[in-house]
Protein backbone atom coordinates (compact mmCIF):
# COMPACT_ATOMS: atom_id res chain seq x y z
CA UNK A 1 0.00 0.00 0.00
CA UNK A 2 1.36 3.44 -0.95
CA UNK A 3 2.21 6.02 1.72
CA UNK A 4 -0.07 9.02 2.29
CA UNK A 5 1.37 12.25 0.87
CA UNK A 6 2.53 14.55 3.68
CA UNK A 7 1.45 17.97 2.40
CA UNK A 8 2.60 19.91 5.48
CA UNK A 9 6.14 18.54 5.35
CA UNK A 10 6.30 19.14 1.60
CA UNK A 11 5.08 22.76 1.77
CA UNK A 12 7.82 23.63 4.29
CA UNK A 13 10.39 22.90 1.56
CA UNK A 14 8.73 24.97 -1.18
CA UNK A 15 10.09 28.37 -2.26
CA UNK A 16 8.01 31.48 -3.01
CA UNK A 17 9.74 31.99 -6.37
CA UNK A 18 8.06 31.45 -9.77
CA UNK A 19 8.21 27.98 -11.26
CA UNK A 20 6.48 24.82 -12.45
CA UNK A 21 5.17 21.86 -10.45
CA UNK A 22 4.44 18.26 -11.53
CA UNK A 23 2.06 16.07 -9.53
CA UNK A 24 2.48 12.27 -9.60
CA UNK A 25 0.13 9.44 -8.64
CA UNK A 26 1.02 6.18 -6.85
CA UNK A 27 2.00 4.58 -10.17
CA UNK A 28 4.58 7.30 -10.89
CA UNK A 29 2.54 8.90 -13.70
CA UNK A 30 2.39 12.69 -14.02
CA UNK A 31 -1.28 13.56 -13.47
CA UNK A 32 -1.07 17.37 -13.48
CA UNK A 33 1.35 20.13 -14.48
CA UNK A 34 0.92 23.72 -13.34
CA UNK A 35 2.83 27.00 -13.09
CA UNK A 36 2.88 29.70 -10.44
CA UNK A 37 4.20 33.19 -9.81
CA UNK A 38 4.59 32.11 -6.17
CA UNK A 39 5.03 28.33 -5.88
CA UNK A 40 4.44 28.16 -2.12
CA UNK A 41 1.22 30.17 -2.28
CA UNK A 42 -0.13 28.23 -5.28
CA UNK A 43 0.68 24.75 -3.96
CA UNK A 44 -0.71 25.59 -0.51
CA UNK A 45 -4.09 26.31 -2.15
CA UNK A 46 -4.44 22.61 -3.10
CA UNK A 47 -4.40 21.48 0.53
CA UNK A 48 -7.03 23.76 2.05
CA UNK A 49 -10.17 22.30 3.61
CA UNK A 50 -12.50 24.07 1.14
CA UNK A 51 -11.29 23.24 -2.38
CA UNK A 52 -12.64 25.14 -5.38
CA UNK A 53 -13.96 22.21 -7.44
CA UNK A 54 -14.61 18.47 -7.58
CA UNK A 55 -11.88 18.18 -10.18
CA UNK A 56 -9.32 19.60 -7.72
CA UNK A 57 -10.60 17.27 -4.96
CA UNK A 58 -10.17 14.24 -7.24
CA UNK A 59 -6.69 15.42 -8.25
CA UNK A 60 -5.48 16.01 -4.67
CA UNK A 61 -6.78 12.59 -3.56
CA UNK A 62 -4.38 10.93 -6.02
CA UNK A 63 -1.22 12.96 -5.31
CA UNK A 64 1.65 10.79 -4.13
CA UNK A 65 4.58 13.05 -4.95
CA UNK A 66 5.23 16.59 -6.27
CA UNK A 67 8.29 17.80 -8.18
CA UNK A 68 9.07 21.52 -8.34
CA UNK A 69 11.21 23.36 -10.92
CA UNK A 70 12.12 26.95 -10.03
CA UNK A 71 12.44 29.47 -12.91
CA UNK A 72 13.86 32.99 -13.14
CA UNK A 73 10.66 34.56 -14.47
CA UNK A 74 6.95 33.92 -14.96
CA UNK A 75 7.52 33.79 -18.71
CA UNK A 76 10.02 30.97 -18.29
CA UNK A 77 7.51 29.15 -16.07
CA UNK A 78 4.76 29.50 -18.69
CA UNK A 79 6.97 28.10 -21.48
CA UNK A 80 8.21 25.23 -19.31
CA UNK A 81 4.67 24.39 -18.18
CA UNK A 82 3.49 23.87 -21.74
CA UNK A 83 6.58 21.86 -22.66
CA UNK A 84 5.86 19.54 -19.73
CA UNK A 85 2.17 19.26 -20.67
CA UNK A 86 3.15 18.23 -24.19
CA UNK A 87 5.73 15.74 -22.85
CA UNK A 88 3.62 14.06 -20.15
CA UNK A 89 0.02 14.52 -21.43
CA UNK A 90 -1.34 14.59 -17.81
CA UNK A 91 -4.93 13.43 -17.44
CA UNK A 92 -6.04 16.39 -15.27
CA UNK A 93 -4.73 19.02 -17.71
CA UNK A 94 -6.71 20.33 -20.68
CA UNK A 95 -4.91 18.78 -23.67
CA UNK A 96 -4.74 20.14 -27.20
CA UNK A 97 -4.39 17.28 -29.68
CA UNK A 98 -2.66 19.19 -32.43
CA UNK A 99 0.92 18.32 -33.37
CA UNK A 100 0.63 19.14 -37.05
CA UNK A 101 2.67 21.90 -38.58
CA UNK A 102 0.57 24.36 -40.55
CA UNK A 103 0.99 24.57 -44.32
CA UNK A 104 2.20 27.64 -46.20
CA UNK A 105 2.34 28.62 -49.86
CA UNK A 106 5.99 28.75 -50.89
CA UNK A 107 7.28 30.98 -53.71
CA UNK A 108 10.79 29.74 -54.43
CA UNK A 109 13.83 31.92 -55.03
CA UNK A 110 14.77 30.14 -58.29
CA UNK A 111 15.57 31.92 -61.56
CA UNK A 112 12.06 30.93 -62.63
CA UNK A 113 10.25 30.77 -59.25
CA UNK A 114 7.70 28.04 -58.60
CA UNK A 115 4.66 27.85 -56.32
CA UNK A 116 4.23 24.94 -53.92
CA UNK A 117 2.75 23.88 -50.61
CA UNK A 118 5.22 23.77 -47.72
CA UNK A 119 5.15 22.35 -44.20
CA UNK A 120 7.85 22.39 -41.55
CA UNK A 121 11.05 24.37 -41.12
CA UNK A 122 11.63 27.20 -43.59
CA UNK A 123 15.12 26.35 -44.83
CA UNK A 124 14.58 26.75 -48.58
CA UNK A 125 15.33 30.15 -50.13
CA UNK A 126 12.12 31.95 -51.06
CA UNK A 127 8.98 33.54 -49.61
CA UNK A 128 6.34 31.91 -47.42
CA UNK A 129 2.69 32.98 -47.30
CA UNK A 130 0.30 31.76 -44.61
CA UNK A 131 -0.30 29.92 -42.41
CA UNK A 132 -3.33 28.12 -43.88
CA UNK A 133 -5.57 25.97 -41.65
CA UNK A 134 -5.03 22.78 -43.65
CA UNK A 135 -3.60 21.29 -46.83
CA UNK A 136 -6.95 21.52 -48.62
CA UNK A 137 -7.01 25.32 -48.28
CA UNK A 138 -3.49 25.53 -49.75
CA UNK A 139 -4.25 23.20 -52.67
CA UNK A 140 -7.45 25.13 -53.43
CA UNK A 141 -5.52 28.42 -53.42
CA UNK A 142 -2.74 27.00 -55.63
CA UNK A 143 -5.31 25.73 -58.14
CA UNK A 144 -6.90 29.19 -58.19
CA UNK A 145 -3.54 30.95 -58.63
CA UNK A 146 -2.66 28.64 -61.50
CA UNK A 147 -5.80 29.70 -63.36
CA UNK A 148 -5.10 33.42 -62.88
CA UNK A 149 -1.29 33.66 -62.92
CA UNK A 150 0.41 30.94 -65.02
CA UNK A 151 3.50 30.48 -62.83
CA UNK A 152 5.03 26.99 -62.73
CA UNK A 153 4.21 24.58 -59.89
CA UNK A 154 6.37 21.64 -60.97
CA UNK A 155 9.28 20.21 -58.96
CA UNK A 156 12.75 21.44 -59.93
CA UNK A 157 13.76 17.91 -60.96
CA UNK A 158 10.95 17.91 -63.56
CA UNK A 159 11.58 21.52 -64.60
CA UNK A 160 15.30 20.90 -65.28
CA UNK A 161 14.75 17.86 -67.47
CA UNK A 162 11.97 18.91 -69.85
CA UNK A 163 12.66 19.33 -73.52
CA UNK A 164 9.03 19.98 -74.44
CA UNK A 165 6.33 21.88 -72.52
CA UNK A 166 3.91 19.86 -70.40
CA UNK A 167 0.11 19.70 -70.39
CA UNK A 168 -0.14 22.70 -68.04
CA UNK A 169 1.41 24.86 -70.77
CA UNK A 170 -0.96 23.43 -73.39
CA UNK A 171 -4.04 24.40 -71.35
CA UNK A 172 -2.71 27.86 -70.47
CA UNK A 173 -1.88 27.25 -66.81
CA UNK A 174 1.88 27.63 -67.09
CA UNK A 175 4.03 29.91 -69.25
CA UNK A 176 6.52 27.10 -69.87
CA UNK A 177 9.79 28.61 -68.57
CA UNK A 178 11.29 25.10 -68.71
CA UNK A 179 11.65 25.38 -72.51
CA UNK A 180 13.75 28.20 -73.96
CA UNK A 181 11.89 30.70 -76.14
CA UNK A 182 8.34 30.07 -74.91
CA UNK A 183 8.20 33.04 -72.53
CA UNK A 184 10.37 36.10 -72.01
CA UNK A 185 12.17 36.64 -68.71
CA UNK A 186 10.37 39.95 -68.18
CA UNK A 187 6.90 38.49 -68.73
CA UNK A 188 7.52 35.58 -66.34
CA UNK A 189 8.95 37.91 -63.68
CA UNK A 190 5.85 40.12 -64.06
CA UNK A 191 3.50 37.18 -63.38
CA UNK A 192 5.58 36.18 -60.35
CA UNK A 193 5.28 39.74 -59.03
CA UNK A 194 1.48 39.58 -59.45
CA UNK A 195 1.46 36.36 -57.40
CA UNK A 196 3.58 38.00 -54.70
CA UNK A 197 1.28 41.02 -54.50
CA UNK A 198 -1.87 38.90 -54.57
CA UNK A 199 -0.70 36.63 -51.74
CA UNK A 200 0.33 39.72 -49.75
CA UNK A 201 -3.24 41.03 -49.94
CA UNK A 202 -2.41 43.83 -52.40
CA UNK A 203 -5.17 43.02 -54.90
CA UNK A 204 -5.67 46.68 -55.82
CA UNK A 205 -2.05 47.00 -56.95
CA UNK A 206 -2.43 43.88 -59.10
CA UNK A 207 -5.57 45.27 -60.75
CA UNK A 208 -4.00 48.71 -61.30
CA UNK A 209 -0.97 47.20 -63.04
CA UNK A 210 -3.08 44.82 -65.15
CA UNK A 211 -5.43 47.60 -66.28
CA UNK A 212 -2.46 49.76 -67.30
CA UNK A 213 -0.99 46.85 -69.31
CA UNK A 214 -4.34 46.14 -70.98
CA UNK A 215 -4.74 49.77 -72.04
CA UNK A 216 -1.20 49.86 -73.43
CA UNK A 217 -1.73 46.62 -75.37
CA UNK A 218 -4.95 48.05 -76.81
CA UNK A 219 -3.19 51.28 -77.86
CA UNK A 220 -0.46 49.19 -79.54
CA UNK A 221 -3.22 47.29 -81.42
CA UNK A 222 -2.17 44.03 -79.66
CA UNK A 223 -5.80 43.02 -79.23
CA UNK A 224 -5.18 39.34 -78.41
CA UNK A 225 -2.81 40.35 -75.63
CA UNK A 226 -5.32 42.95 -74.38
CA UNK A 227 -8.09 40.31 -74.33
CA UNK A 228 -5.89 37.89 -72.37
CA UNK A 229 -5.11 40.57 -69.76
CA UNK A 230 -8.82 41.51 -69.62
CA UNK A 231 -9.66 37.89 -68.72
CA UNK A 232 -6.97 38.00 -66.03
CA UNK A 233 -8.48 41.20 -64.58
CA UNK A 234 -11.96 39.64 -64.47
CA UNK A 235 -10.59 36.53 -62.73
CA UNK A 236 -8.87 38.61 -60.04
CA UNK A 237 -12.05 40.65 -59.48
CA UNK A 238 -14.19 37.50 -59.15
CA UNK A 239 -11.88 36.18 -56.44
CA UNK A 240 -11.63 39.41 -54.44
CA UNK A 241 -15.41 39.94 -54.50
CA UNK A 242 -15.93 36.59 -52.73
CA UNK A 243 -13.47 37.25 -49.92
CA UNK A 244 -14.30 38.51 -46.45
CA UNK A 245 -11.80 41.38 -46.39
CA UNK A 246 -10.90 44.14 -43.96
CA UNK A 247 -9.53 47.40 -45.27
CA UNK A 248 -7.09 47.59 -42.39
CA UNK A 249 -4.76 44.89 -43.74
CA UNK A 250 -5.15 42.97 -40.48
CA UNK A 251 -2.63 40.29 -39.55
CA UNK A 252 -4.26 38.37 -36.72
CA UNK A 253 -5.72 35.16 -35.32
CA UNK A 254 -9.28 35.26 -33.96
CA UNK A 255 -10.26 32.70 -31.33
CA UNK A 256 -13.91 31.95 -30.55
CA UNK A 257 -15.09 29.48 -27.89
CA UNK A 258 -18.17 27.33 -27.24
CA UNK A 259 -18.66 25.06 -24.20
CA UNK A 260 -21.50 22.61 -23.55
CA UNK A 261 -22.09 19.17 -22.01
CA UNK A 262 -18.48 18.96 -20.81
CA UNK A 263 -17.09 19.47 -24.31
CA UNK A 264 -15.31 22.56 -25.61
CA UNK A 265 -14.79 23.80 -29.15
CA UNK A 266 -12.20 26.46 -29.91
CA UNK A 267 -12.46 27.92 -33.41
CA UNK A 268 -9.50 29.82 -34.88
CA UNK A 269 -9.75 32.19 -37.86
CA UNK A 270 -6.44 32.82 -39.64
CA UNK A 271 -6.41 36.35 -41.09
CA UNK A 272 -3.42 37.69 -42.99
CA UNK A 273 -3.28 41.02 -44.83
CA UNK A 274 -6.98 41.47 -44.09
CA UNK A 275 -8.00 38.20 -45.78
CA UNK A 276 -9.46 35.18 -44.04
CA UNK A 277 -7.12 32.41 -45.20
CA UNK A 278 -9.34 29.84 -43.53
CA UNK A 279 -10.34 28.51 -40.14
CA UNK A 280 -10.16 25.39 -38.05
CA UNK A 281 -12.07 23.92 -35.09
CA UNK A 282 -10.29 22.26 -32.17
CA UNK A 283 -11.79 20.00 -29.51
CA UNK A 284 -9.31 19.87 -26.61
CA UNK A 285 -9.55 17.00 -24.16
CA UNK A 286 -11.25 18.49 -21.09
CA UNK A 287 -11.18 16.72 -17.68
CA UNK A 288 -14.53 16.66 -15.86
CA UNK A 289 -15.25 19.70 -13.71
CA UNK A 290 -12.95 22.03 -15.64
CA UNK A 291 -14.01 25.68 -15.84
CA UNK A 292 -14.25 27.43 -19.23
CA UNK A 293 -11.57 29.94 -18.21
CA UNK A 294 -9.03 27.16 -17.70
CA UNK A 295 -9.95 25.59 -21.05
CA UNK A 296 -9.34 28.85 -22.94
CA UNK A 297 -6.19 29.77 -21.03
CA UNK A 298 -4.61 26.33 -21.47
CA UNK A 299 -5.64 26.06 -25.12
CA UNK A 300 -4.15 29.42 -26.08
CA UNK A 301 -0.91 28.64 -24.25
CA UNK A 302 -0.54 25.20 -25.84
CA UNK A 303 -1.63 26.39 -29.28
CA UNK A 304 1.09 29.03 -29.53
CA UNK A 305 3.80 27.97 -27.10
CA UNK A 306 3.93 24.24 -27.88
CA UNK A 307 3.66 24.68 -31.64
CA UNK A 308 5.86 27.77 -31.85
CA UNK A 309 8.55 26.11 -33.97
CA UNK A 310 6.11 25.56 -36.80
CA UNK A 311 3.54 28.31 -36.23
CA UNK A 312 3.92 31.86 -37.50
CA UNK A 313 2.74 34.28 -34.83
CA UNK A 314 0.42 37.08 -36.00
CA UNK A 315 0.75 40.67 -34.83
CA UNK A 316 -2.47 40.40 -32.83
CA UNK A 317 -4.63 37.73 -31.21
CA UNK A 318 -8.35 38.37 -30.58
CA UNK A 319 -9.91 36.30 -27.81
CA UNK A 320 -13.52 35.51 -26.96
CA UNK A 321 -12.66 35.34 -23.26
CA UNK A 322 -10.91 37.57 -20.74
CA UNK A 323 -7.77 35.73 -19.55
CA UNK A 324 -6.37 36.29 -16.07
CA UNK A 325 -2.84 35.87 -17.47
CA UNK A 326 -3.38 37.93 -20.63
CA UNK A 327 -0.37 40.20 -20.03
CA UNK A 328 1.89 37.25 -19.22
CA UNK A 329 0.81 35.44 -22.39
CA UNK A 330 1.40 38.55 -24.53
CA UNK A 331 4.85 39.05 -23.00
CA UNK A 332 5.79 35.38 -23.54
CA UNK A 333 4.66 35.41 -27.17
CA UNK A 334 6.43 38.72 -27.79
CA UNK A 335 9.65 37.30 -26.35
CA UNK A 336 9.27 34.23 -28.55
CA UNK A 337 8.56 36.22 -31.73
CA UNK A 338 11.14 38.95 -31.11
CA UNK A 339 8.44 41.61 -31.68
CA UNK A 340 5.37 42.91 -29.90
CA UNK A 341 2.33 40.59 -29.97
CA UNK A 342 -0.96 42.12 -28.79
CA UNK A 343 -3.65 40.02 -27.08
CA UNK A 344 -7.06 41.72 -27.17
CA UNK A 345 -10.36 40.57 -25.63
CA UNK A 346 -12.77 43.48 -26.24
CA UNK A 347 -12.40 44.51 -29.90
CA UNK A 348 -14.56 46.97 -31.83
CA UNK A 349 -15.52 47.49 -35.47
CA UNK A 350 -14.22 44.92 -37.96
CA UNK A 351 -12.44 43.05 -35.20
CA UNK A 352 -15.72 42.58 -33.33
CA UNK A 353 -17.20 41.14 -36.55
CA UNK A 354 -14.30 38.71 -36.79
CA UNK A 355 -14.84 37.61 -33.20
CA UNK A 356 -18.57 37.13 -33.75
CA UNK A 357 -17.78 35.00 -36.82
CA UNK A 358 -15.34 32.84 -34.82
CA UNK A 359 -17.86 32.49 -31.97
CA UNK A 360 -20.64 31.43 -34.38
CA UNK A 361 -18.38 28.88 -36.05
CA UNK A 362 -17.34 27.46 -32.67
CA UNK A 363 -20.98 27.03 -31.60
CA UNK A 364 -21.94 25.40 -34.92
CA UNK A 365 -18.97 23.02 -34.85
CA UNK A 366 -19.73 22.05 -31.23
CA UNK A 367 -23.38 21.26 -32.03
CA UNK A 368 -22.23 19.04 -34.92
CA UNK A 369 -19.61 17.31 -32.75
CA UNK A 370 -22.06 16.65 -29.91
CA UNK A 371 -24.55 15.24 -32.41
CA UNK A 372 -21.89 12.93 -33.88
CA UNK A 373 -20.78 11.86 -30.41
CA UNK A 374 -24.37 11.14 -29.44
CA UNK A 375 -24.74 8.95 -32.53
CA UNK A 376 -21.51 7.00 -31.94
CA UNK A 377 -22.42 6.59 -28.24
CA UNK A 378 -25.83 5.16 -29.18
CA UNK A 379 -24.23 2.79 -31.69
CA UNK A 380 -21.58 1.55 -29.26
CA UNK A 381 -24.23 1.06 -26.55
CA UNK A 382 -26.30 -0.98 -29.02
CA UNK A 383 -23.26 -3.08 -29.99
CA UNK A 384 -22.37 -3.67 -26.34
CA UNK A 385 -25.92 -4.96 -25.78
CA UNK A 386 -25.66 -7.31 -28.78
CA UNK A 387 -22.29 -8.65 -27.60
CA UNK A 388 -23.47 -8.81 -23.94
CA UNK A 389 -20.70 -6.49 -22.73
CA UNK A 390 -21.15 -3.87 -19.98
CA UNK A 391 -19.62 -1.17 -22.23
CA UNK A 392 -17.25 -0.70 -25.16
CA UNK A 393 -14.57 1.87 -24.43
CA UNK A 394 -12.08 0.78 -27.09
CA UNK A 395 -12.39 -1.26 -30.26
CA UNK A 396 -9.77 -2.26 -32.84
CA UNK A 397 -10.26 -3.68 -36.34
CA UNK A 398 -7.82 -5.40 -38.73
CA UNK A 399 -7.79 -5.79 -42.50
CA UNK A 400 -5.29 -7.08 -45.08
CA UNK A 401 -4.62 -5.58 -48.53
CA UNK A 402 -2.41 -6.79 -51.41
CA UNK A 403 -2.34 -7.22 -55.20
CA UNK A 404 -1.89 -10.84 -56.27
CA UNK A 405 -0.02 -11.45 -53.03
CA UNK A 406 2.48 -8.62 -53.57
CA UNK A 407 3.14 -5.61 -51.29
CA UNK A 408 0.94 -6.98 -48.50
CA UNK A 409 -0.10 -4.42 -45.89
CA UNK A 410 -2.18 -4.95 -42.74
CA UNK A 411 -4.08 -2.12 -41.10
CA UNK A 412 -5.28 -1.59 -37.54
CA UNK A 413 -7.79 1.17 -36.82
CA UNK A 414 -8.93 2.21 -33.35
CA UNK A 415 -12.27 3.57 -32.09
CA UNK A 416 -12.94 4.86 -28.58
CA UNK A 417 -16.16 6.14 -27.02
CA UNK A 418 -16.03 9.22 -29.28
CA UNK A 419 -15.39 7.40 -32.57
CA UNK A 420 -12.22 7.08 -34.70
CA UNK A 421 -8.86 7.67 -32.96
CA UNK A 422 -6.90 8.39 -36.13
CA UNK A 423 -3.71 9.28 -34.27
CA UNK A 424 -3.55 5.62 -33.18
CA UNK A 425 -4.17 4.04 -36.59
CA UNK A 426 -1.27 1.79 -37.63
CA UNK A 427 -0.09 0.02 -40.79
CA UNK A 428 2.12 -3.08 -40.81
CA UNK A 429 4.23 -4.19 -43.76
CA UNK A 430 3.91 -7.98 -43.95
CA UNK A 431 6.96 -10.03 -44.98
CA UNK A 432 8.19 -13.63 -44.82
CA UNK A 433 4.90 -15.29 -45.81
CA UNK A 434 3.67 -17.15 -48.89
CA UNK A 435 2.34 -14.48 -51.31
CA UNK A 436 -1.43 -14.21 -51.04
CA UNK A 437 -1.70 -16.08 -47.72
CA UNK A 438 -4.12 -13.80 -45.87
CA UNK A 439 -4.27 -16.13 -42.87
CA UNK A 440 -0.50 -15.94 -42.35
CA UNK A 441 -0.67 -12.15 -42.79
CA UNK A 442 -3.38 -11.87 -40.11
CA UNK A 443 -1.41 -14.18 -37.82
CA UNK A 444 1.70 -12.00 -38.20
CA UNK A 445 0.02 -8.65 -37.61
CA UNK A 446 -1.84 -9.86 -34.50
CA UNK A 447 1.39 -11.21 -32.97
CA UNK A 448 3.16 -7.93 -33.67
CA UNK A 449 0.28 -5.89 -32.27
CA UNK A 450 -0.52 -7.87 -29.13
CA UNK A 451 2.60 -9.93 -28.35
CA UNK A 452 4.02 -7.21 -26.09
CA UNK A 453 3.16 -5.17 -23.01
CA UNK A 454 0.11 -2.90 -23.46
CA UNK A 455 -1.12 -0.11 -21.18
CA UNK A 456 -4.31 -1.10 -19.38
CA UNK A 457 -6.22 1.82 -20.94
CA UNK A 458 -5.27 0.59 -24.43
CA UNK A 459 -6.46 -3.01 -24.09
CA UNK A 460 -9.42 -3.21 -26.51
CA UNK A 461 -12.81 -4.48 -25.39
CA UNK A 462 -13.56 -5.77 -28.90
CA UNK A 463 -11.22 -6.86 -31.70
CA UNK A 464 -12.90 -7.09 -35.11
CA UNK A 465 -11.31 -9.40 -37.66
CA UNK A 466 -12.39 -8.59 -41.22
CA UNK A 467 -12.59 -11.85 -43.17
CA UNK A 468 -14.88 -14.27 -41.39
CA UNK A 469 -14.26 -17.76 -39.97
CA UNK A 470 -10.75 -18.44 -41.31
CA UNK A 471 -9.32 -15.16 -40.14
CA UNK A 472 -11.07 -15.49 -36.77
CA UNK A 473 -9.46 -18.92 -36.33
CA UNK A 474 -6.04 -17.33 -36.80
CA UNK A 475 -6.87 -14.68 -34.20
CA UNK A 476 -8.02 -17.30 -31.69
CA UNK A 477 -4.83 -19.33 -32.26
CA UNK A 478 -2.61 -16.27 -31.75
CA UNK A 479 -4.34 -15.25 -28.52
CA UNK A 480 -4.19 -18.82 -27.17
CA UNK A 481 -0.39 -18.74 -27.53
CA UNK A 482 0.24 -15.20 -26.23
CA UNK A 483 2.43 -14.94 -23.14
CA UNK A 484 1.91 -11.33 -22.06
CA UNK A 485 1.58 -9.39 -18.77
CA UNK A 486 -1.88 -7.99 -19.61
CA UNK A 487 -5.21 -9.84 -19.55
CA UNK A 488 -5.34 -11.49 -22.98
CA UNK A 489 -8.81 -12.88 -22.21
CA UNK A 490 -10.34 -9.39 -21.89
CA UNK A 491 -10.80 -8.57 -25.63
CA UNK A 492 -13.77 -10.18 -27.34
CA UNK A 493 -12.68 -11.51 -30.76
CA UNK A 494 -15.35 -11.05 -33.42
CA UNK A 495 -15.13 -12.17 -37.06
CA UNK A 496 -16.91 -10.17 -39.78
CA UNK A 497 -17.68 -11.93 -43.06
CA UNK A 498 -18.84 -9.88 -46.04
CA UNK A 499 -22.28 -10.63 -47.36
CA UNK A 500 -23.30 -11.90 -50.79
CA UNK A 501 -21.97 -9.60 -53.53
CA UNK A 502 -20.09 -7.80 -50.70
CA UNK A 503 -23.13 -5.58 -50.12
CA UNK A 504 -23.34 -3.50 -46.95
CA UNK A 505 -26.02 -4.73 -44.54
CA UNK A 506 -25.50 -8.42 -45.33
CA UNK A 507 -22.50 -9.02 -43.04
CA UNK A 508 -22.31 -12.16 -40.90
CA UNK A 509 -20.69 -12.03 -37.45
CA UNK A 510 -18.88 -14.93 -35.75
CA UNK A 511 -17.90 -15.46 -32.11
CA UNK A 512 -16.28 -18.83 -32.88
CA UNK A 513 -14.64 -20.10 -36.13
CA UNK A 514 -16.61 -23.36 -36.03
CA UNK A 515 -19.85 -21.84 -34.77
CA UNK A 516 -22.90 -20.51 -36.56
CA UNK A 517 -22.78 -16.89 -37.56
CA UNK A 518 -25.49 -14.33 -36.96
CA UNK A 519 -26.62 -11.21 -38.78
CA UNK A 520 -28.00 -7.89 -37.60
CA UNK A 521 -30.89 -5.98 -39.23
CA UNK A 522 -29.72 -3.44 -41.86
CA UNK A 523 -31.06 -0.58 -39.72
CA UNK A 524 -29.32 -1.75 -36.54
CA UNK A 525 -27.10 0.93 -34.89
CA UNK A 526 -24.80 -1.90 -33.76
CA UNK A 527 -24.30 -2.97 -37.38
CA UNK A 528 -23.64 0.63 -38.43
CA UNK A 529 -20.70 1.01 -36.04
CA UNK A 530 -19.27 -2.33 -37.25
CA UNK A 531 -19.56 -1.15 -40.86
CA UNK A 532 -17.95 2.18 -39.93
CA UNK A 533 -14.85 0.67 -38.30
CA UNK A 534 -14.61 -2.08 -40.94
CA UNK A 535 -14.69 0.50 -43.77
CA UNK A 536 -12.10 2.66 -41.97
CA UNK A 537 -9.81 -0.36 -41.66
CA UNK A 538 -10.32 -1.32 -45.30
CA UNK A 539 -9.55 2.20 -46.56
CA UNK A 540 -6.50 2.47 -44.29
CA UNK A 541 -5.12 -0.87 -45.56
CA UNK A 542 -5.71 0.00 -49.22
CA UNK A 543 -4.07 3.41 -48.77
CA UNK A 544 -0.95 1.80 -47.30
CA UNK A 545 -0.85 -0.86 -49.99
CA UNK A 546 -1.10 1.70 -52.80
CA UNK A 547 1.76 3.74 -51.32
CA UNK A 548 3.93 0.65 -51.03
CA UNK A 549 3.05 -0.48 -54.55
CA UNK A 550 3.87 2.96 -56.01
CA UNK A 551 7.20 3.02 -54.18
CA UNK A 552 8.15 -0.42 -55.49
CA UNK A 553 7.06 0.54 -59.00
CA UNK A 554 9.41 3.53 -58.98
CA UNK A 555 12.43 1.80 -57.49
CA UNK A 556 12.32 -1.93 -58.29
CA UNK A 557 14.14 -1.59 -61.63
CA UNK A 558 16.97 0.42 -60.09
CA UNK A 559 17.31 -1.96 -57.14
CA UNK A 560 18.66 -4.66 -59.42
CA UNK A 561 21.58 -2.51 -60.64
CA UNK A 562 24.83 -3.16 -58.79
CA UNK A 563 26.36 0.01 -57.35
CA UNK A 564 23.03 1.86 -57.07
CA UNK A 565 22.05 1.99 -53.41
CA UNK A 566 19.15 3.84 -51.74
CA UNK A 567 20.89 7.26 -51.76
CA UNK A 568 21.88 7.04 -55.44
CA UNK A 569 18.39 5.78 -56.37
CA UNK A 570 16.86 8.75 -54.60
CA UNK A 571 19.27 11.18 -56.27
CA UNK A 572 18.64 9.69 -59.75
CA UNK A 573 14.85 9.83 -59.41
CA UNK A 574 14.89 13.34 -57.95
CA UNK A 575 17.33 14.74 -60.53
CA UNK A 576 15.58 13.10 -63.50
CA UNK A 577 12.03 13.76 -62.33
CA UNK A 578 11.08 10.12 -61.88
CA UNK A 579 11.75 6.74 -63.46
CA UNK A 580 10.34 7.71 -66.86
CA UNK A 581 12.65 10.71 -67.09
CA UNK A 582 15.58 8.47 -66.21
CA UNK A 583 14.60 5.93 -68.90
CA UNK A 584 14.59 8.72 -71.51
CA UNK A 585 17.94 10.19 -70.42
CA UNK A 586 21.22 9.71 -72.30
CA UNK A 587 24.42 8.35 -70.72
CA UNK A 588 25.84 11.90 -70.62
CA UNK A 589 22.74 13.24 -68.82
CA UNK A 590 22.82 10.41 -66.26
CA UNK A 591 26.53 11.06 -65.61
CA UNK A 592 25.69 14.65 -64.60
CA UNK A 593 23.76 13.39 -61.56
CA UNK A 594 25.87 13.94 -58.41
CA UNK A 595 27.60 10.72 -57.33
CA UNK A 596 27.18 8.94 -60.69
CA UNK A 597 30.38 8.16 -62.62
CA UNK A 598 30.59 7.72 -66.40
CA UNK A 599 30.96 3.95 -65.99
CA UNK A 600 27.98 3.66 -63.63
CA UNK A 601 25.92 5.91 -65.92
CA UNK A 602 26.55 3.50 -68.81
CA UNK A 603 25.55 0.53 -66.61
CA UNK A 604 22.33 2.28 -65.57
CA UNK A 605 21.55 3.30 -69.17
CA UNK A 606 21.92 -0.23 -70.57
CA UNK A 607 20.14 -1.87 -67.60
CA UNK A 608 17.09 0.34 -68.15
CA UNK A 609 17.12 -0.27 -71.91
CA UNK A 610 17.02 -4.03 -71.36
From Swiss-Prot:
Residues 204-239 form the UVR domain. Belongs to the UvrC family. SMART domains: GIYc, HhH1. The lineage of its organism: Bacteria, Pseudomonadati, Pseudomonadota, Gammaproteobacteria, Enterobacterales. It is found in: Cytoplasm. Signal peptide: none annotated. This is UvrABC system protein C. GO terms for molecular function: DNA binding; excinuclease ABC activity. PANTHER family: UVRABC SYSTEM PROTEIN C, UVRC/OXIDOREDUCTASE. It comes from Salmonella heidelberg (strain SL476). Interacts with UvrB in an incision complex. GO terms for biological process: nucleotide-excision repair; SOS response. HAMAP family: UvrC (MF_00203). InterPro entries: GIY-YIG_endonuc, GIY-YIG_endonuc_sf, GIY-YIG_UvrC_Cho, Hlx-hairpin-Hlx_DNA-bd_motif, RuvA_2-like, UVR_dom, UVR_dom_sf, UvrABC_protein_C. Keywords: Cytoplasm, DNA damage, DNA excision, DNA repair, Excision nuclease, SOS response. The UvrABC repair system catalyzes the recognition and processing of DNA lesions. UvrC both incises the 5' and 3' sides of the lesion. The N-terminal half is responsible for the 3' incision and the C-terminal half is responsible for the 5' incision.
Amino acid sequence: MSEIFDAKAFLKTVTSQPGVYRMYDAGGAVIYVGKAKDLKKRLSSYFRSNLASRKTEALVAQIQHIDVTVTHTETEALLLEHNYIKLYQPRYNVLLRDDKSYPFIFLSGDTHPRLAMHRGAKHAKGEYFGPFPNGYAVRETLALLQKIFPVRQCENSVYRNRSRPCLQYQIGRCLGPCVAGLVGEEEYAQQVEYVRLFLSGKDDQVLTQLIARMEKASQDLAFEEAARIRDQIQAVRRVTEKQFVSNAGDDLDVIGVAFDAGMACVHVLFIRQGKVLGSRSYFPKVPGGTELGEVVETFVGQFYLQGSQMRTLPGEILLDFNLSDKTLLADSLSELAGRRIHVQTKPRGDRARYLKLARTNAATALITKLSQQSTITQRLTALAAVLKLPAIKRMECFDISHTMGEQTVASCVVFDANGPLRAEYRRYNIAGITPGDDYAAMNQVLRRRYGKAIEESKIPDVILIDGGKGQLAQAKAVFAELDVPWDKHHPLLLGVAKGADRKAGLETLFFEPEGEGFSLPPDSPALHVIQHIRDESHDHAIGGHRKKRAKVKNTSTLETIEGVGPKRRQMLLKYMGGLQGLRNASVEEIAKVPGISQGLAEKIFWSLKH
